[in-house]
Each structure stands twice: as C-alpha cells, then as structure tokens.
C-alpha cells in the first residue's frame, strides 16, 4: 500500500510545474525524485539495484550512442543517431582515459546483439564502472523503439550513501504524464527495499532550478 496518495502526487506535480512556469528557464528542467533512506546499512545490507521503464520518457534530450555492426550502423545513420563501429572502438585501444571520456560523453549506449559479448574485450570495464554498459539490440528489433525504451528506463542504485536521486520527468510534460511516472517510480523503489516503506526516510520532488517539494 503506497503511503503517498495520488492526490498528494498530483498536488506536488502541480506545484513543481507551476513554479517552473512562473520562472521560465532557457532549457528544459529535469524533474528529479530525491530519496533519503533510513534503517539501512549500505555496508551490511544488500546494496540494491533495479531498473524500470516509465510510461513517459523522462529525459528526451538524453544522448545515446550505438555501438554497432554494419547493419545497425546503417540504421543509426538513417535515424541521425551517433554510432561507433568495432574499428572505432579498437582505436580507443582500451585506454582508460579515452573510455572514460566516451562514457562521459553519452548518457547511455546501445550495442548490436552480436557485439555485446565483445564490449568488455574491446573497451575493458570502463562502461560498466560508469553504470553505462550497453543495452542489446537485435536486427529484428525496431532501433527507434529501443532508443525510446532506453530513454524511458530509470535506474535505482544504492551506493555508499543513504540518498539517491533519479530523473522522473521534465517540466514540459503534462501533469498526468509526470504523475504517472512519479507514482510508478516510487512504488518500484519501495519494492526494492528490504523493509519497504520502513526504509524510506524522505521523498522529495524537485525541478533542476525549482524549490523542493516534500512528498513523504
């Protein structure tokens, strides 16, 4: 049972969107869910990690790069998406600095299914370390659909500190879209926690430049 009511979610979304409307920025603000955990010991308790696909793309401007074979390079080119071939990856020569730079340049990667097993051999552990190991795409998959799927997926990952933040939307979304993303994200997070709601200290929603709104 969610401890945050749909009405509370709606009023938080309304407040955030109204605030951004009053102070228009020259970029699209991201809306983030910030979570404070309690009764959790990251040293002893299992550090959870989970991904979920939201009904509406939270970050449409997310930059994506395709690591592809000839077929997928061609598809990427037609779709106007950045792409790299095996030869391009070999040129990085497993150089840690260059791989790190690549991981920084893009928000996410998609790789041809046939190449996915070669990625660690070609690049070393750099992309995994950055939490950006590529999602696989097969030739029968719709590449554009895959890109939307990757852009819609958010990841909750507990590291050493008891707070985390995830993008759940942006200020140009309709209220219903943002509310749907937010409630799904909260319920999924609670399902990852050992003691569910008992592990949640606070839930705050905030746009990039806006005031925080406490939900819980």
Curated annotation (Swiss-Prot):
The keyword Transmembrane is assigned to this record: no
SUPFAM superfamilies: Ribosomal protein L1
Highest taxon of the lineage: Eukaryota
Subcellular location: Cytoplasm
A GO CC annotation given for this chain: cytosol
One Pfam short name: Ribosomal_L1
InterPro entries documented for this protein: eL8/uL1-like, Ribosomal_uL1, Ribosomal_uL1-like, Ribosomal_uL1/biogenesis, Ribosomal_uL1_3-a/b-sand, Ribosomal_uL1_CS
Membrane keyword on record: no
Sequence positions bearing Phosphoserine: 85, 128
Keywords: Cytoplasm, Phosphoprotein, Ribonucleoprotein, Ribosomal protein
Example GO BP: cytoplasmic translation
CDD domains: Ribosomal_L1
MF term (GO), any: structural constituent of ribosome
Family label: Belongs to the universal ribosomal protein uL1 family.
Function: Component of the ribosome, a large ribonucleoprotein complex responsible for the synthesis of proteins in the cell. The small ribosomal subunit (SSU) binds messenger RNAs (mRNAs) and translates the encoded message by selecting cognate aminoacyl-transfer RNA (tRNA) molecules. The large subunit (LSU) contains the ribosomal catalytic site termed the peptidyl transferase center (PTC), which catalyzes the formation of peptide bonds, thereby polymerizing the amino acids delivered by tRNAs into a polypeptide chain.
Other remarks on this protein: There are 2 genes for uL1 in S.pombe.
Subunit structure: Component of the large ribosomal subunit (LSU). Mature yeast ribosomes consist of a small (40S) and a large (60S) subunit. The 40S small subunit contains 1 molecule of ribosomal RNA (18S rRNA) and at least 33 different proteins. The large 60S subunit contains 3 rRNA molecules (25S, 5.8S and 5S rRNA) and at least 46 different proteins. uL1 forms part of the L1 stalk.
Designated name of the protein: Large ribosomal subunit protein uL1A
Gene transcribed to yield this protein: rpl102
């Amino acid at each position: 049972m969610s401890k945050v009511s749909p009405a509370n979610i709606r009023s938080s979304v309304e407040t955030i969107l109204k605030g951004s409307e009053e102070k228009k920025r020259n970029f699209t603000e991201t809306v983030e869910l910030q979570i404070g955990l309690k009764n959790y010991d990251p040293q002893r308790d299992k550090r959870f990690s989970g991904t979920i696909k939201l009904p509406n793309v939270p970050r449409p401007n997310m930059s994506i790069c395709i690591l592809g074979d000839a077929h997928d390079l061609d598809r990427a080119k037609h779709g106007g998406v950045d792409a790299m071939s095996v030869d391009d990856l070999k040129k990085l020569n497993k150089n840690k600095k260059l791989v790190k730079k690549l991981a920084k340049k893009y928000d996410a990667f998609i790789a041809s299914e046939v190449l996915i097993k070669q990625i660690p051999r070609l690049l070393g552990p750099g992309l995994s370390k950055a939490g950006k190991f590529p999602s696989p795409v097969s030739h029968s998959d719709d590449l554009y659909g895959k890109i939307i799927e990757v852009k819609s997926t958010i990841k909750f990952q507990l590291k050493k500190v008891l707070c985390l933040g995830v993008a759940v939307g942006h200020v140009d979304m309709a209220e219903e879209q943002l509310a749907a993303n937010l409630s799904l994200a909260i319920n999924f997070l609670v399902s990852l926690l050992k003691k569910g709601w008992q592990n949640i200290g606070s839930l705050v929603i905030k746009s990039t430049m806006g005031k925080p709104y406490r939900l819980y």
